[in-house]
UniProtKB/Swiss-Prot annotation:
Source organism (scientific name): Mus musculus (Mouse)
Keyword Signal on entry: no
GO cellular component, one term: cytoplasm
Statement: the UniProt record of this protein carries the keyword Transcription regulation: yes
Miscellaneous field: Imprinted gene expressed from the paternal allele in blastocysts.
Record's keyword terms, sorted: Cytoplasm, Transcription, Transcription regulation
A Pfam family this chain is assigned to: PUA
Top-level taxon: Eukaryota
Compartment annotation: Cytoplasm
Molecular function per GO: RNA binding
Chief localization: cytoplasm
Name of the protein in its database record: Malignant T-cell-amplified sequence 2
Domain PUA positions: 92-171
């Protein structure tokens, strides 16, 4: 999604949000990520300006004080950025890939089923279309944010094809866009 994303070329405009819109976004975030509720006022303080950065391909990035927090495409679900996920790793369920998959994930490839079922990988129960943080064997922080394309039980049974779609990974265009003022 952000493989060829460039801040100078991809950003079209930036809009400061009204309080009523911010409340709606906060309720959508608590509905989507139940574990985030106690931390939401710390992530998005009431007095700080909340802006939406609009980008090409109908991408919207939610920022607070210039810090990129969440993004979404069209009016779809919000995804946390990796920078936010590294601060609050508990907001998403985790899946773990083995060491052999790391270089492919960091180049933007989707996570294949064998990378989730081999020794060193850990596959936790998750339904289809669940937003997950993809961790790596022996690493502390998430490599990417992805969406389950198969249920965990199906990944173990079938063990072929794409298991998790890679949405945002370390060193992609969004990762390099550190802040937006």
């Amino acid at each position: 999604m952000f493989k060829k994303f460039d801040e100078k070329e991809s950003v079209s405009n930036c809009i400061q949000l009204k309080t009523s819109v911010i409340k709606g976004i906060k309720s959508q975030l608590t509905e989507q990520f139940p574990g985030i509720e106690p931390w939401l006022n710390q992530i998005m303080p009431k007095k700080d300006p909340v802006k939406i950065v609009r980008c090409h391909e109908h991408m919207e990035i939610l920022t607070v004080n210039g810090e990129l927090l969440f993004f979404r495409q069209r009016k779809g679900p919000f995804y946390p950025t990796l920078r936010l996920l590294h601060k609050y790793p508990f907001i998403l369920p985790h899946q773990q890939v083995d060491k052999g998959a790391i270089k492919f994930v960091l180049s933007g490839a989707n996570i294949m089923c064998p990378g989730l079922t081999s020794p060193g990988a850990k596959l936790y129960t998750a339904a289809v279309d669940t937003i997950v943080a993809v961790m790596a064997e022996g690493k502390e922080h998430a490599l990417c944010v992805g969406v389950m394309k198969m249920a965990a039980a199906d990944i173990e049974k079938i063990n072929k094809g794409i298991g998790i779609e890679n949405i945002h990974y370390l060193n992609d265009g969004l990762w390099h866009m550190k802040t937006y003022k």
